[in-house]
Amino acid sequence: MKGTLLLLALLMIGELGFHTTEACVPFFAGYAGVISGSRLWLYHELSAFNGTPKETVAYEKIQDCYKEQGVKSQTLEPQILASILVTPECLQYYSEETFTKIKDALKKISQH
């Protein structure tokens, strides 16, 4: 189900007219907030998108699913996301400093 959600999110980004490379960092920041298990982190990441209260509740429910799945789910997801992040398109668009920040954030998540 999570893989389907990820695919759906990536397709939606493309359909809304964004360049996928421009959406890499915001997508991963939001996704990291979801799988972190921290409501505070989730709210911080979602605040950048000015979402509606219903959207926030939906993300909270997704976060609850990750909490229910346990540590295995939370540690595998950052590894998968990190491998997606280093696609040639994303590497061309963002600086090395940006990638370092994202990788550090993903490492923090996988350590919890």
Curated annotation (Swiss-Prot):
Gene Ontology CC terms, in alphabetical order: extracellular space
Secretion signal span: 1-23
Alphabetical UniProt keywords: Allergen, Secreted, Signal
Classification via PROSITE patterns: SCGB
Tissue: Expressed in lacrimal gland, at higher level in males than females.
Subcellular localization, as worded in the UniProt entry: Secreted
Keyword Signal: yes
Superkingdom of the source species: Eukaryota
Protein family according to the UniProt entry: Belongs to the secretoglobin family.
Name this protein carries in UniProt: Secretoglobin family 2B member 24
Organism: Mus musculus (Mouse)
Source species taxonomy: Eukaryota, Metazoa, Chordata, Craniata, Vertebrata
Encoding gene, per UniProt annotation: Scgb2b24
